[in-house]
């Protein structure tokens, strides 16, 4: 399956109920929107139920204000046996001026599940068509290597007493 086959875009207007006391969208709300957009991509690619396994490298660069749009662009970057990494870029758009600003990028890992057993299942391979997709895929392999190394040292590394 090609990257473009599952890519999605989502638009959300920032309303007062999405905002903090400073009038900008709550970080947790943006994370929720990122998770939703990424889940659509993972579902489209795998055609299976999916669950969120990890969020990586999420930073909030500039705030999105009440009345602005949050534009989310999501695409798959890596497929492993049962897991998929999805990149989500978030922009703000000022509806009065048309100005767009990059506000954040997140990498979200999903696992595809069998609908009956709820166990991880294989997903279709990823067809890379462009040089940009190949470069993003190479970077995704490195992120995956770092995630696995981190998980190994954090969960199965030294005992908790030895870290004190």
Q: PLM ranges: what are they?
A:
Residues 11-14, 59, 109:
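Generic structural detector for well-ordered beta-strands
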Residues 19, 55, 113:
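Hydrophobic pocket-lining residues within nucleotide cofactor-binding pockets
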Residues 2-5, 25, 39-73, 77-84, ...:
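Hydrophobic beta-strand-centered segment that forms part of the acyl-chain substrate-binding groove
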């Amino acid at each position: 399956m090609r990257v473009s086959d599952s890519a999605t875009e989502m638009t959300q207007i920032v309303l007062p109920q999405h905002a903090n006391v400073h009038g900008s969208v709550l970080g947790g709300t943006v994370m929720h929107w990122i998770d939703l957009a990424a889940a659509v991509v993972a579902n489209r690619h795998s055609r299976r139920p999916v669950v969120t396994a990890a969020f990586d490298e999420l930073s909030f660069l500039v705030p999105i204000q009440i009345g602005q749009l949050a534009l989310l662009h999501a695409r798959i970057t890596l497929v492993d046996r049962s897991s998929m990494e999805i990149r989500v870029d978030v922009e703000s758009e000022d509806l009065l001026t048309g100005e767009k600003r990059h506000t954040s990028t997140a990498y979200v890992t999903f696992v595809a599940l069998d609908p009956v057993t709820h166990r991880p299942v294989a997903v279709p391979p990823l067809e890379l068509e462009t040089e940009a997709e190949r470069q993003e895929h190479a970077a995704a392999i490195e992120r995956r290597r770092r995630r696995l190394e981190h998980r190994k040292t954090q969960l199965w590394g030294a005992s908790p007493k030895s870290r004190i």
